[in-house]
């Protein structure tokens, strides 16, 4: 059977041969003098020392360096030089520096083996796995801080930490988790699978992609460095005047946001350029996978909203170092300026986190329902609608902090309106599940949990959009529970679904199903037992970020804390499964274990560096499950093999 006469696009599809000008050499290692994570750490440390010395020298002529009387110039210079040293040590600056001095950049070396995961690499698949490691590092660190928080809240009178230490732990936990969550899907799964799903051989700008990863990791180190400097007491929102009054740890917070913001902008721009310009022939917008739609909407938010955060962080750094007064009220500034800048980014950021999770679920459930995705166009439109409306709701975070009362009804309305496109996305999932013969594999269980958790988080969000309710419960545990249900209950559960679904393709090794089931049920049960009581605690008046509370709330807090410890243990099951399945007792995965129609499953495993020997021509969308006579997903230009609508690969005569 041949499809060559039916191709919608006549394109040249020769076997892949790397151009001579872009040829790469292959070797297993790089030697101790080559650039890798070790040299990056050393260069970053030396850069920190040099920057601190230079900052002290520059600021020595200032009688008063900052509004707090501290030498924040030296702190900032140290962090800047640390990041530059880190990037230089990993090799991220080799190419631009060579071009800057007019020299030809050296050919890239394509490393094999484990060494490639600890170096600057231009393969989007390697970058995706590097992001996985980085995100898991964020998650582990933030999780340990969460355990410390719940340990303190076991007793309202017997304290593990001082009040000052407690608020700094809360602040560090919130900031690390928010920055991790901003990249938890778009970094690992977006970078890895978007080119595969659209039939591309690479990202539009591979160096920018790799650069965004190492900047992301540098931002993590900058934010985590706040703890040795005494932390910051502002919570993850960094509100002034606490921001301007805080110690040197605040510089780490502001510069960390600045650095991670640069990486987020680079990632968003690169993903958008790739999706718009690198789709395979025949992949019209109505054939783009729903996960790619979610990444495109997220990339638009990253590109448009993140510059506001970067500018806001820069203003705060100037206030801390050279005595400008953007947020210093007594010198003519306004603390409301930071709140507006922060939340103009901060609420789109909620959907930067949520939209990729919706995309993962929309991509997975048709596979295990063996049904086409219900109302595909509505799902895509819902994601675009959420992205657009997310820019018009940020003022609901200021209902109590000085917003003009006449503006409250407008932002209450826009906040309620955003539930409409979100509801469309939710109903698309319900329509797909309706009357389906569902296979309850581990990825599908996590997807079902996403709908359950996000329904609770979404309904509680509708209450919070109402001004009287918001004013009543603002600053309490009700808001905290709502937020964790939407972000952790939605995004992190979706990320786990994506890992269990796609890791067999990423590594060629299947995860242990029994451990996966243990992980799911413990995580799902103890997540709800941890955070649902917080709705009650919040309605009873317990404030956030305070290490003591009314004695009558101890039972609920103890119940929540014990559940949180068991929730943390569920992640240990995941890490054990990861180590067992991928390293200790690896089992080779079938080429397409879930019988998915997705284009990413139609290439070889392990995936070759160039992804596809021939660029496919897309014939239809990837959701024609259980449809008799459905067309093949794509023509791969190989007359001997046809990729069928069942997800299998057959020879031209129909034999398996």
Give the location of each predicted region:
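Membrane-embedded and interfacial regions of multi-pass energy-transducing membrane proteins
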Residues: 2-6, 10-656
């Amino acid at each position: 059977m041949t499809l060559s006469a039916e191709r919608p696009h006549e394109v040249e599809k020769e076997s892949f041969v790397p151009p001579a000008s872009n040829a790469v050499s292959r070797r297993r290692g790089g030697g101790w003098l080559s650039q890798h994570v070790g040299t990056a750490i050393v260069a970053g440390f030396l850069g920190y020392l040099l920057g601190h010395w230079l900052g002290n020298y520059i600021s020595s002529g200032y009688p008063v360096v900052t509004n707090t009387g501290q030498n924040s110039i030296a702190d900032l210079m140290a962090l800047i030089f640390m990041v530059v040293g880190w990037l230089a040590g990993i090799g991220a600056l080799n190419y631009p520096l060579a071009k800057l001095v007019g020299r030809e950049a050296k050919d890239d070396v394509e490393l094999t083996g484990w060494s490639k995961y600890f170096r600057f690499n231009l393969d989007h698949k390697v970058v995706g796995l590097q992001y996985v490691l980085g995100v898991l590092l964020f998650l582990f660190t933030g999780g340990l801080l969460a355990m410390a928080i719940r340990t303190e809240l076991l007793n309202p009178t017997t304290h593990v930490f001082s009040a000052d230490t407690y608020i700094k732990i809360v602040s560090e936990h919130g900031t690390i988790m928010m920055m991790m969550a901003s990249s938890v899907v778009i970094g690992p799964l977006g970078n890895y699978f978007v080119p595969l799903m659209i039939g591309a051989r690479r990202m539009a700008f591979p160096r920018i992609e790799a650069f965004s990863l190492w900047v992301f990791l540098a931002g993590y180190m900058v934010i985590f460095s706040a703890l040795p400097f005494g932390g910051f007491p502002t919570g993850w929102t960094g509100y002034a005047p606490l921001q301007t009054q805080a110690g040197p740890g605040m510089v780490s917070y502001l510069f960390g946001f600045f650095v991670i913001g640069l990486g987020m902008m680079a990632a968003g721009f690169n993903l958008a350029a790739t999706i718009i310009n690198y789709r395979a022939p025949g992949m019209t917008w109505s054939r783009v996978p729903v996960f790619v739609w979610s990444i495109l909407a997220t990339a638009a938010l990253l590109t448009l909203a993140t510059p506001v955060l970067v500018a806001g962080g820069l203003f705060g750094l100037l206030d801390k170092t050279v005595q400008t007064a953007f947020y210093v009220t007594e010198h003519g500034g306004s603390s409301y300026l930071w709140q507006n800048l922060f939340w103009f980014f901060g609420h789109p950021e909620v959907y930067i986190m949520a939209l990729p999770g919706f995309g993962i679920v929309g991509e997975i459930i048709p596979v295990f329902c063996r049904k086409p995705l219900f109302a595909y166009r509505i799902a895509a439109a819902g994601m675009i609608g959420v992205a657009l409306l997310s820019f018009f709701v940020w003022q609901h975070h200021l209902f109590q902090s000085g917003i003009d009362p006449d503006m409250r009804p407008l932002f209450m309305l826009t906040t309620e309106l955003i539930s409409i496109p979100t509801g469309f996305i939710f109903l698309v999932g319900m329509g797909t599940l309706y009357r389906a013969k569902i296979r309850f594999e581990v990825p599908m269980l996590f997807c079902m949990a996403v709908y359950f958790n996000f329904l609770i988080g979404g309904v509680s969000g509708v209450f919070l959009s109402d001004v009287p309710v918001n004013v009543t419960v603002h600053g309490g545990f009700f808001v905290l529970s709502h937020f964790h249900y939407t972000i952790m209950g939605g995004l992190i559960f979706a990320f786990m679904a994506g890992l269990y679904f796609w890791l067999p393709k990423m590594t060629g090794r299947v995860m242990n199903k029994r451990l996966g089931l243990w992980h799911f049920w413990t995580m799902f049960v103890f997540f709800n037992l941890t955070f649902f009581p917080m709705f009650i605690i919040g309605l009873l008046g317990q404030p956030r970020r305070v290490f003591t509370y009314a004695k009558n709330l101890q039972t609920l807090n103890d119940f929540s804390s014990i559940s949180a410890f068991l929730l943390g243990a569920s992640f240990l099951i995941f890490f054990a499964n990861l180590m067992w399945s991928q390293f200790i007792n690896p089992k080779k995965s079938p080429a397409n274990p879930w019988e998915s129609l997705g284009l990413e499953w139609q290439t070889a495993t392990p995936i070759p560096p160039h992804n596809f020997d021939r660029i496919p021509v897309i014939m239809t969308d990837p959701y024609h499950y259980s449809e008799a006579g459905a067309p093949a997903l794509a023509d791969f230009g190989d007359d001997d093999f046809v990729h069928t609508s069942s997800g299998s690969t057959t020879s031209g005569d129909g034999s398996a």
